[in-house]
Amino acid sequence: MILVIDVGNTNIVLGMYDGDNLVHHWRISTDRTKTTDEYGMLVKSLFDHSNVSFEQVEGVILSSVVPPVIFPLEQMSQRYFNVRPIVVGPGVKTGLDIHVENPREVGADRIVNAVAGIAKYDGPLIIVDFGTATTYCYIDEKRRYHGGIISPGIMISVEALYQRAAKLPRIELATPPTVIGKNTIQAMQSGTYYGYVAQVDGIVNRMKREVGEATVIATGGLARLISEHAETIDHVDSFLTLEGLRLIYERNQK
């Protein structure tokens, strides 16, 4: 089986593939201070809970937007699985034609999402990834990646409101019962949630005015919540990044 690892700023998502089937997946917090052995023991506990053994891991691929976490995960793969991992970056075959000023600046997560998006949905595509930052990427019908948009994630907005406004409480992100809030918490929830929904629809519509019609895919931890009221999202694919990692792994075995 193949272990795929997606390292984000807030969470690390791991998936285990048997062929092209995702048979297990886990989410843990990203911790820049963890050592190789600490990550190894954490992964072992996840494996034990799912009745998976280290010996079943035949290959590992990882993408990361947090450089300090790459080394301990590489070492973990070699020490505990006896496998040298593929790290998504320059020199790794993706099959994607990148049309931006500096291709090396494009985040590994955005490349991985684009690979999976084209394989599953064909182009043209707009992929919206709701993470610590929210990213919007455009890929045309010829598999050319043209760049996109990076904006602060919704949870950054929630936290900033609490930290910078003295009388406002920290809130849980939730869909309020009405747009017009009847109390402070509802008003804050409405502002963050519906404000973000409006941002998504506004940005996607502006992108479409520039490039024409495109299928819009949402992924990331908050994709389902936002898509409940976002009018421009066509599909929610929670495991798009994991699928992209699997595809890139396979392309680099040939």
Curated annotation (Swiss-Prot):
Annotated GO MF terms: ATP binding; metal ion binding; pantothenate kinase activity
Organism: Exiguobacterium sp. (strain ATCC BAA-1283 / AT1b)
Disulfide partners: none
Protein name, as recorded: Type III pantothenate kinase
Residue numbers binding substrate: 107-110, 184
Biological processes, Gene Ontology terms: coenzyme A biosynthetic process
Gene that this sequence comes from: coaX
Pathway the protein takes part in: Cofactor biosynthesis; coenzyme A biosynthesis; CoA from (R)-pantothenate: step 1/5
Cofactor binding summary note: A monovalent cation. Ammonium or potassium.
Residues reported in the UniProt entry to bind K(+): 129
Binding-site list for ATP: 6-13, 132
Alphabetical list of InterPro entries matching this protein: ATPase_NBD, Type_III_PanK
Annotated PANTHER family: TYPE III PANTOTHENATE KINASE
Localization per record: Cytoplasm
Main enzyme class: transferase
Subunit structure: Homodimer.
Known catalytic reactions: (R)-pantothenate + ATP = (R)-4'-phosphopantothenate + ADP + H(+)
Protein family (similarity comment): Belongs to the type III pantothenate kinase family.
Lineage: Bacteria, Bacillati, Bacillota, Bacilli, Bacillales
Protein purpose: Catalyzes the phosphorylation of pantothenate (Pan), the first step in CoA biosynthesis.
